[in-house]
From Swiss-Prot:
Keywords: Hydrolase, Multifunctional enzyme, Purine biosynthesis, Transferase. Belongs to the PurH family. GO terms for cellular component: cytosol. The gene is purH. The keyword Repeat does not apply. One of its GO terms (biological process) is 'de novo' IMP biosynthetic process. InterPro entries: AICAR_Tfase_dup_dom_sf (IPR024051), Cytidine_deaminase-like (IPR016193), MGS-like_dom (IPR011607), MGS-like_dom_sf (IPR036914), PurH-like (IPR002695). Residues 1-148 form the MGS-like domain. It catalyses: (6R)-10-formyltetrahydrofolate + 5-amino-1-(5-phospho-beta-D-ribosyl)imidazole-4-carboxamide = 5-formamido-1-(5-phospho-D-ribosyl)imidazole-4-carboxamide + (6S)-5,6,7,8-tetrahydrofolate; IMP + H2O = 5-formamido-1-(5-phospho-D-ribosyl)imidazole-4-carboxamide. The IMP cyclohydrolase activity resides in the N-terminal region. This is Bifunctional purine biosynthesis protein PurH. The keyword Transferase applies.
Length: 529
């Protein structure tokens, strides 16, 4: 639908000033009259643009430290007035039509994220006039264009140039959708913040103040539709958060290959989050959301070679993640050796991409380098509800470990124990990981009985001819019985790292002592379901 509307008058009032000067200049150059408020008006005037302050237009000053400035009939009448229907009443009250509203809102999220933010600080960053104008303009999108994203500025000017200064109804409708999404997300942030403040407001403890809000509002943006979901009879799409601050599969750039599938994204996330645990050059290979091979070394080439050796059969059609740039030598080793669905790394060299391009089905993602892990929430959907918890960023240092066995671990055993403990965090429970010399040699995942996970890890190692004697074993949760220790001892494990906490800890420790195994408690569990 065309239904073009010329843009003759625009109201600009933005907190985020990025691109606003250039946009205002472009509008003014095309004969658009500019109205503006406060800091935005001053900025435009400083740049020599002809701009009318809203207070001059309404004849009513800004007041109450800027709390009241655009809440006026001459503003909202100009936005909400229906062209061809309300013209007479607008003329009677000297209300000029406003054809475009350019608004983004007070930075509430940034304010409450700052350390030491008080309730008073948060309250003063709740925008009132801005959302009201946004909603008014979006409601009247038949006649008015509402612009809430600076990323739309260039496209709007191009369309105006192509349509003699007008915008089509299709464009105004699309802009209105973005506007309602913008205000919905904004109000959700405010509701979540105030909901989380209820205990503190009523004088409860700091611990109580950290509880989750009583109503949880979530906003995600669709990044892509998918051919199907986890199975071909399920429809699916991928939604992402705005302003993600950590390198992730959601922010990664696909530089090569066909579109990612639902399972590709889930598995790539598992691989990337695991490889982030390591500071040394590391490789993680994932299949069906479980690591099937992990290693660290002096180079990603050697790390890949060692990770692959853990379980070459499962690595076929897997996802490979690195924590260093993908180089040509490593890319060649992968392509020559196996079929791979996705490779993700902080970056990829041009030479590496030329090599992987020879395999059209290989998807290559670059996610940028990451720094500190960012706390957040994890969600698990259940029928009729949503489980919410803090993201599992729990880590233990060497100083926090407790040796509970008679024998102390050797330095190598301790290194291997810490290594496989990091891996176990990303293996589906019940999780058992065998590791030796900074590589996994057997992984038992997802078994209902912990002892069977231990047995499977041993079988995996034997199948690949990997030496288990002198290796470390990690368990994501405590051993309820000694049978898991007996199974590990039978294949030559010499060191066990586990959370501890079973009512039979004494029995389990005694089994370790009986077999001459060093046992370490972390006092931290890493269930993963």
């Amino acid at each position: 639908m065309q239904q073009r509307r010329p843009v003759r008058r625009a109201l600009l009032s933005v907190s985020d000033k990025a691109g606003i000067i250039e946009f205002a200049q472009a509008l003014s150059a095309r004969g658009v009259e500019l109205l503006s408020t406060g800091g935005t008006a001053r900025l435009l005037a400083e740049k020599g643009l002809p701009v009318t302050e809203v207070s001059d237009y309404t004849g009513f000053p800004e007041m109450m430290d800027g709390r009241v400035k655009t809440l006026h009939p001459k503003v909202h009448g100009g936005i909400l007035g229906r062209r061809g229907q309300d013209d007479a009443i607008m003329e009677q009250h000297h209300i000029a039509p406003i054809d475009m509203v350019v608004v983004n809102l007070y930075p509430f999220a940034e304010t409450v994220a700052r350390e030491g933010c008080s309730l008073e600080d948060a309250v003063e960053n709740i925008d009132i006039g801005g959302p009201t104008m946004v909603r008014s303009a979006a409601k009247n999108h038949k006649d008015v264009a509402i612009v809430v994203k600076s990323s739309d500025y260039d496209a709007i000017i191009k369309e105006m140039d192509a349509n003699e200064g007008s915008l089509t109804l299709d464009t105004r409708f699309d802009l209105a959708i973005k506007a309602f999404e913008h205000t919905a997300a904004y109000d959700s942030m405010i509701a979540n913040y105030f909901g989380s403040m209820v205990p503190a407001y009523h004088g409860e403890s700091k611990e109580a103040a950290g509880r989750f809000p009583r109503t949880l509002n979530l906003n995600f943006i669709k990044k892509q539709d998918m051919r199907y979901g986890e199975n071909s009879h399920q429809q699916a799409a991928f939604y992402i958060e705005e302003n993600v601050k950590e390198a992730s599969v959601a922010t990664a750039q696909q530089v090569q290959g066909k579109a990612l599938s639902y399972n590709n994204i889930a598995d790539t996330d598992a691989a990337l989050e695991c490889v982030k645990e390591f500071n040394e050059p590391a490789c993680v290979i994932v299949k069906h959301a479980n690591p099937c091979g992990v290693a660290v070394s002096t180079s990603i080439l050697d790390a890949y070679d060692r990770a692959y050796k853990t379980d070459p059969t499962s690595a076929f059609g897997g996802i490979i993640a690195f924590n260093r740039e993908l180089d040509a030598e490593t890319a060649q080793a992968i392509i020559s050796r196996q079929f791979v669905e996705v490779i993700i790394a902080p970056s990829a060299s041009e030479e590496a991409l030329k090599i992987t391009a020879a395999k059209q089905n290989v998807r290559v993602l670059t996610c940028g380098q990451w720094g500190e892990r960012v706390p957040g929430l994890d969600f698990k959907r259940v029928n009729g509800g949503l489980l919410v918890q803090d993201r599992d960023l729990g880590m233990v240092s060497e100083a926090e470990l407790r040796v509970v066995s008679k024998r102390q671990p050797t330095e190598q055993e301790l290194r291997d124990a810490l290594f496989c403990w990091k891996v176990a965090k990303f293996v589906k429970s019940n999780a058992i990981v065998y590791a030796k010399e900074n590589m996994t040699i057997g992984i038992g995942a997802g078994q209902m009985s912990r002892v069977y996970s231990a047995k499977i890890a041993g079988i995996k190692a034997a199948d690949e001819g990997l030496e288990v004697k002198g290796s470390a074993m990690a368990s994501d949760a405590f051993f309820p019985f000694r049978d898991g220790i007996d199974a590990a001892a039978a294949v030559g494990v010499s060191c066990v790292i586990q959370p501890g906490g079973s009512i039979r800890d004494d029995e389990v420790i005694a089994a370790a002592d009986e077999h001459g195994i060093a046992m370490i408690f972390t006092d931290m569990r890493h269930f993963r379901h």
